[in-house]
Structure formats: structure tokens, C-alpha cells
Regions:
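Surface-exposed extracellular loop regions of Gram-negative outer-membrane beta-barrel proteins
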Residues: 328, 381, 425-432, 455-504, ...
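Short, acidic, small-residue-rich periplasmic hinge/interaction motif at the N-terminus
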Residues: 24-30, 40-79, 99-100, 108, ...
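Short, acidic Ser/Thr/Gly-rich low-complexity loop/linker segments typical of extracellular
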Residues: 1-10
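Outer-membrane beta-barrel signature, preferentially recognizing the C-terminal barrel domain
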Residues: 296, 396-399, 439-442, 470-524, ...
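Outer membrane beta-barrel strand-and-loop segments of large Gram-negative receptors
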Residues: 353-357, 401-403, 492, 498, ...
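N-terminal periplasmic accessory domains that precede
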Residues: 40-46, 86-89, 123-124, 138-139, ...
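Short acidic/polar hinge/loop motifs at secondary-structure boundaries
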Residues: 14, 92, 118-144
């Protein structure tokens, strides 16, 4: 039998008791040592230096490795390391789609992202990490018990551990031109002396977005109302975010640190929409409007802080995190129809969060046992006032979540087994205008089990897993306020939304550079957006966007990934089929269609001589009809060309997104006595330049993982 030691030098081999054994220890650069086994072995290795004239080592690291909870993609030494920033690299991971801070793991949903065990709170942080600093990326499709019950998937990025003392820095500039320009600047400095790290980071971004929408709404009531709308949306903002902190490692067994992260808008953010609507009643035109909607968002300072301790006490590992988060926003909305100011609204939000998490682990029965607790305390207050098109709202939510969890993992020959359980107690207090509403103040007690097993041998692997997931609605949905979208479109929250629960079963297998997975999910109280008429007696022809829950939904899917290497060319093919069996009869929608959706992407990487790298990728998503939702075929092609200089400390890249200008999104939606057609284009076609420079590259050793991430996302 044989094994490789862990980072602390400990190792584990399975053997029968009562028999004599010899242990052989080998380490590169030292002479091999052989000695009889005894319970507390100590090995003294002598240097073994040999002068070699020339050695050439050729090997290919597999891009994908399968584990019991998902898969691991090796980044260092592969084409993934040449994708620019971590944000640009993520969509090139197997079964990961999305961009601009919005990512999706096929068959799972939006992931929680970690960098070196530290949760990513601000997605712009992914722009600041270069892909060539990342050692590996784990895509966890069955999160363990230590993760919150609403975590659908996890992506963990592990950076390359670099040595060095003194001052180090990293600077990055990005510019892209589409319908309007976007730009950002990033600076990071780290000073290391002995076991102390002092670091400061700053990020400045100017964002301009542009979109065009063609829309048709039809409402059936006492009459048939149809509204056709064409509008253009723009959003302009400038933001600054920073990070200041320290990390201290007095020895190899203990470390602690603190970081403070402020963020604010520079001036006001502007969100505008303008266009025309034509409304008909029983095919006779009743209204023609030229409209303009302007919203100003006034942002003060948001504050976040994290403190952590990570240490070893004998065989026990301890990881503790405490978090604080404070956010507030204020927006004014004004709508003008045919030169008349018809709508004025004011929204104010203030929220705070306190969270703590403790994880303790130790070896047990030739495996690993971990347990811990997590607590989050959230306070959010929303005040909405308007000039008569709906009703004012004053919603105040206080929520406390207490969780305890335990997890055990064990390796038996070629098998890896993992089992865990998590208990969560959630108490919500909902107030309207200072009065507690008991019907909207539920208490939940949930047990979340996790089971996973995997087998691997000689390049082949197979895994099975099960997890229960529980989701609470975003706080923005738990409100009674009516939001104005246009004269004939309103939106509303729903404070009566129940908790959504998902039972997910998955299986996967791999061989060499082929990977296949399948999943089945049973979803209870699934959140869904619906459309319906809004108060036909007082607001005829107005469409209301709302959120409801569907009692039972089934979701099926299969995925295939192929990632061979053919000389300079490294292609990666992803094929995914998703089928949603959804019946919305119980919420009043009779439309039910069942047609799967296929997603196909081809990612082509060319590792060229002299530091050149070229990537071109394209995807196609087919039309589908699932439940009351109908989509059309869509796709895009994007490319990247980069060159490294000065021993890879300087990198310059040219990027092109949506080259053929095909990034349109078409969908039709059936509702309660209502129907909608949409054609949407966002400013996806962009051409850009990126310049990145680093010196004396060292990484901060900050090990804080953060707590209460699920509540941060909801806020």
C-alpha cells in the first residue's frame, strides 16, 4: 500500500493489525529511508544530491478530476490559466455558464464562490484575481453540511502559494467599448515581514449599460387589452470599493486576521428608460404614449468587516469567522407620459447583518470528522412612498438563523464516502408600519442531509450524491409595495412566499478526458414569476408582475464534457439537456408544455509559441417550451488574443464579445388571463483591451472564510 503525506506531514494507510510491516519513505532530493513500523514513527532523511547533465520531463495533467461532491478542474499548467481574470476564466470551467458576476452551474443554479477559503462578497473581486494565479478550481455540485441550506453549488478557487518578503503589487486596467464605454482600475499592495501581512486594495469602476426591448402584452378580461412597447434602457454608475487589513501567522499552527471593506457610489447612479407604447381595447387604439422613466440611486457608504482565526491544537483544526455588513440605498423614480409627470416614487432601504461561524475537525476512525455552528442575525427596513398610483409601504423584517452541522468523510481503498447533516432554526418577524404580522412571521426547523460516494481507479471514476436544499426568498420580494414599471406594467412582492425545498439526486462518471453526469430534482414550492391583470376595475389594461410558488415541480438533466488535447489545440465541448416538468394549474395558469432545452458550447484554446494565446468560443441554446415559459434559439461567439512579456509579469490582451451581434434573448410567457412576448438585447457586443502588471508576486495569507454568505446574498 502507499500514500502521499498531507501538508502537515501526517499520513494514513489501511493495514491489518498485529502484523509486521516495513515503511519506506521517499522524498525528492533525499535518500529513501526504510524502517520497521511502530505506532509513533519518526523518519530522518539524509540529502541525496546528484548532478545531472540534462533532464526533460513531459506530462499532461488531466483537466478534470472527479470527487464525491463534484469535480476539480486544474488551472495551473492548462489553458485556463491564460484567460485573463478569474471572472473571465469561470465561464470556461466545465458546466459553468455566465459572465459579468452572474454565473450558473448547469443543473444546480447560482454558485457561492470562494477564493482560498474566503467567500467572495463582491463579484468585482473576481476581476482582481488573475487566472494565472489560480492553482485549481473545484465545482461542487453537492455542497456538504457546512454550507448553508440554500447553497445550490460552490466554486472554490485555490491560488498558487507564493513565497517572498517585502512589498508586492498588482495593477490591472480594463477598457471595453460597446454602445458605450466601460472601464475599471484595480490596485493591490501587500507588505510582508516575517509572519505579518499588511494589505490594501482599491477598485474603481465606471459602468455604462444599454439595452433595447420589444414587448407585447395581452390581457383577457371583460375586454381584450393589448399593449405594444418599444423602449431603450440605459444605466450609468461609478463605484469605488476598497479593502484594508492584516494577517498574522505567529507560527505554522496559528493565524488570525481582520479586514475592512468599504464601498460607495461616486455621485448618483442613473437608470433611465424611454420609448413608446400603443394600447388597444378589442383591436381599437385607446392610448399612444411617449414615455420617459428616470431613476436616481443615491448610495452612501456600505461597510463590511471580517475577523478570523485558523489554528491547530494537537489533532484538532479550528476555523472561526465573524462578519458584519451594513448597506443602505435611496432611489427617486419619476415617470413622464406625453410630457406630463404622472408618477413619482421614493424608495429607501437600510439593512444590517451579524454572522459567526465555527468549524472544528479532527481525525476519527481512519477518516475525518468535522462539526460546527453558524448564526446570522439580519435586520432590513424598506420604506416606499408614491403619489397615488398604488399604496405606500413600510416593511420591516428581522430574522435570526441558528445552525449546527456535522460531517464525516472516509476513504476505503478506491472509494471515498461522505455523509453530513445540518440543523437550521429560522425565526422571522415581519412588521407593516410598526405592527407585527403573525401570519407573515414564520418559524422553521429543518434538517438538511447530505450523502455522497465516489469510486476512482486507473483513470476511471463514478460518483453518486444526494442533498436537500432549502431556499428563502430575497428580501426584495417580501414586500407589499407596488413598483411602477410603465403606465401599463406594475410589479409586486409577496410576503406570503413559503420556503422552497429541493431534493436533488445526481450521478457522474468519467474516463480519461470524457465526463458525464445526470441529475433529478424534486422541487417543492418552487418560486416563479407570473403575470396577471392588475385591478381591472380601476386600472384596466395594466399587467402585474408577481411571484408565486408552484407546489411540486420535477427537473431532469444530463451533461457531457469532452476536453482532449491535440497539439497546440485544446478544445472543450459541453453538451447539456435540461427538462423542467412544471404544472402551474394550482396557481391559475393552464398552459403546460414539455420540450427540453439543449445547450451546446465549443471552447477552443490555442497555446502558441512565444507567449501567445488565442481563444475562440461559441455557444448555442435551442428553443424550448417548458411549462408556461417558451424560449427561442440563441447564441454568441467571443474571442481573446493575449501576449505575455517580462517573464509573465506583464500581460496584454485584446477581447471581442458577441462578435456577430447575435446576443438576443426571446421568450414568451403565459400567465393568469395574460400573455407576453419579449425580444431583448443587452450591450453584449464589446471590444476591449486589458493590461495587467505585477511585481514581487506574493499572495496575502489571509484565511478568513466569512460567515452568513447566504444572508448577504439575500440582502
Amino acid at each position: 500500500n502507499g500514500c502521499v503525506t498531507r501538508e502537515d506531514g501526517s499520513f494514513l494507510m489501511i493495514a491489518e493489525e498485529g502484523r509486521p510491516y516495513l515503511i519506506r519513505v521517499s522524498y525528492i532530493g533525499y535518500k529513501t529511508e526504510v524502517q520497521p513500523y511502530h505506532p509513533t514513527p519518526t523518519f530522518h532523511l539524509l540529502p541525496d544530491t546528484q548532478l545531472m547533465q540534462e533532464v526533460t520531463i513531459s506530462a499532461r495533467r488531466p483537466m478534470i478530476e472527479v470527487g464525491p461532491n463534484g469535480l476539480k478542474a486544474n488551472v495551473a499548467g492548462t489553458s485556463l490559466a491564460r484567460m485573463g481574470s478569474a471572472a473571465e476564466m469561470l465561464p470556461h470551467l466545465p458546466f459553468v455558464t455566465g459572465r459579468n458576476g452572474e454565473y450558473n452551474v448547469m443543473g444546480c443554479g447560482s454558485p457561492v464562490i470562494y477564493i482560498n477559503n474566503k467567500k467572495v462578497r463582491d463579484m468585482t473581486e473576481l476581476e482582481r484575481i488573475r487566472a494565472n494565479e489560480i492553482l485549481s478550481a473545484e465545482v461542487i455540485t453537492t455542497p456538504g453540511a457546512e454550507y448553508a441550506s440554500d447553497v445550490a453549488a460552490v466554486i472554490r478557487l485555490h491560488t498558487i502559494r507564493r513565497r517572498g518578503q517585502g512589498l508586492s503589487g498588482h495593477f490591472n486596467t480594463t477598457y471595453s467599448q460597446g454602445h458605450s464605454a466601460n472601464a475599471n482600475e484595480y490596485m493591490a499592495l501587500n507588505y510582508r515581514t516575517g509572519g505579518l501581512d499588511l494589505f490594501v486594495k482599491g477598485y474603481l469602476a465606471q459602468q455604462n449599460s444599454y439595452g433595447k426591448t420589444t414587448n407585447m402584452n395581452r390581457i383577457k378580461g371583460s375586454a381584450i387589452w393589448q399593449t405594444n412597447k418599444n423602449d431603450v434602457q440605459t444605466h450609468k454608475s461609478q463605484r469605488f470599493s476598497g479593502e484594508l487589513g492584516f494577517n498574522y501567522e505567529p507560527d505554522e499552527h496559528h493565524s488570525f486576521g481582520l479586514r475592512y471593506m468599504p464601498e460607495t457610489g461616486i455621485g448618483n447612479a442613473d437608470r433611465n428608460s424611454s420609448g413608446r407604447t400603443v394600447t388597444r381595447r378589442n383591436d381599437e387604439e385607446t392610448d399612444r404614449i411617449n414615455f420617459t422613466t428616470a431613476e436616481q440611486i443615491h448610495t452612501g457608504w456600505d461597510h463590511a468587516a471580517n475577523a478570523y482565526y485558523a489554528g491547530e491544537l494537537g489533532k484538532w483544526n479550528i476555523d472561526f469567522n465573524a462578519d458584519y455588513l451594513f448597506k443602505r440605498s435611496h432611489s427617486d423614480q419619476n415617470a413622464i407620459n406625453n410630457d406630463d409627470a404622472t408618477v413619482q416614487a421614493d424608495s429607501r432601504m437600510r439593512s444590517s447583518l451579524y454572522a459567526a461561524k465555527l468549524v472544528v475537525s479532527a481525525p476519527l476512525w481512519n477518516g475525518r470528522f468535522s462539526f460546527g455552528t453558524e448564526e446570522t442575525f439580519t435586520n432590513r427596513h424598506d420604506i416606499f412612498t408614491q403619489n397615488g398610483f398604488s399604496a405606500d409601504a413600510d416593511d420591516h423584517i428581522k430574522q435570526s438563523v441558528y445552525a449546527a452541522f456535522a460531517d464525516y468523510s472516509k476513504s476505503i481503498r478506491h472509494w471515498k464516502l461522505n455523509m453530513g447533516i445540518r440543523y437550521e432554526h429560522q425565526q422571522t418577524d415581519y412588521y407593516e408600519k410598526g405592527i407585527k404580522i403573525d401570519a407573515q412571521s414564520p418559524t422553521y426547523n429543518d434538517i438538511i442531509p447530505v450523502l455522497a460516494a465516489s469510486w476512482s481507479h486507473n483513470g476511471k471514476s463514478f460518483s453518486l450524491s444526494y442533498r436537500l436544499r432549502k431556499n428563502n426568498p430575497d428580501y426584495s420580494l417580501l414586500t407589499n409595495s407596488i413598483r411602477y414599471r410603465s403606465k401599463y406594467e406594475y410589479s409586486q412582492g409577496n410576503p406570503l412566499l413559503k420556503t422552497q425545498k429541493t431534493h436533488r439526486f445526481s450521478a457522474s462518471t468519467s474516463w480519461n478526458w470524457l465526463y458525464f453526469s445526470a441529475y433529478f430534482s424534486r422541487i417543492l414550492n418552487m418560486y416563479t414569476n407570473i403575470i396577471m391583470p392588475y385591478k381591472e376595475d380601476t386600472h384596466p389594461g395594466v399587467l402585474l408582475f408577481a411571484t408565486q410558488t408552484i407546489p411540486t415541480t420535477h427537473n431532469y438533466g444530463i451533461s457531457l464534457n469532452a476536453s482532449p488535447k491535440l497539439g497546440y489545440w485544446e478544445p472543450q465541448l459541453n453538451v447539456n439537456m435540461a427538462f423542467l416538468d412544471m404544472n402551474a394549474n394550482k396557481i391559475g395558469i393552464t398552459e403546460r408544455r414539455n420540450q427540453p432545452r439543449f445547450y451546446i458550447s465549443l471552447d477552443n484554446n490555442f497555446n502558441l509559441p512565444k507567449g501567445w494565446f488565442f481563444n475562440i468560443e461559441g455557444y448555442l441554446s435551442t428553443a424550448s417550451r417548458q411549462g408556461f415559459f417558451v424560449t427561442r434559439t440563441e447564441g454568441q461567439i467571443s474571442a481573446r488574443l493575449s501576449k505575455s512579456f517580462l517573464n509573465e509579469t506583464l500581460n496584454i490582451a485584446l477581447t471581442a464579445n458577441d462578435i456577430l451581434h447575435t446576443g438576443y434573448y426571446h421568450f414568451n410567457l403565459y400567465g393568469i388571463n395574460a400573455y407576453m412576448e419579449n425580444r431583448i438585447y443587452r450591450d453584449f457586443q464589446r471590444f476591449g483591451l486589458q493590461v495587467s502588471y505585477k511585481f514581487n508576486a506574493t499572495k496575502s495569507k489571509y484565511k478568513g472564510t466569512g460567515a452568513g454568505q447566504s444572508e448577504k446574498n439575500r440582502l
